[in-house]
Amino acid sequence: LEGEPILLGALPFSRDVPHLRSVGVTGVINMCIEYHGPIKAYAQFDVEQLWLPTVDFTPPSLGNIHRGVNFIDKHVDAGGKVYVHCKAGRGRSATVVLCWLIHRRGFTPAQAAAYLTKQRPHINKGLAERAVVQEFHRSFLAQHDPTVTPQ
């Protein structure tokens, strides 16, 4: 994403890891239940992977979204970048990135989806309306505004 410390895309292979590291990636979030990632290459290039196995065409759990958001923050706050992927980089991974934008930039789900779609037009439509995204947004608001009650 232009201007952001996050890269969103499809599953990487061992041959992709040197390039990811060269552009500042220090962490990878792998949303694929069906793919463990190029673990040896990550170790060789000192890239930390967070594996949040999620079945294709289903949204990640709220717990996994929070784990992903915290992982991104950890790497970004240390000066790194994070590559977030699922198989195609359109659904599972885009959901985590959308929630990080809500968390870090204070966007609404609709604003985050519009921002993401502008930079990656082929993400799945309707991510902002996913129940888990709405729940994440409500919990974000409740943390930052004591008059809001999470439902």
What are these regions (language model features)?
Residues 76-98:
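A phosphate-binding catalytic loop at a beta-strand-loop-alpha-helix junction
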Residues 145-151:
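Intrinsically disordered, low-complexity regulatory segments
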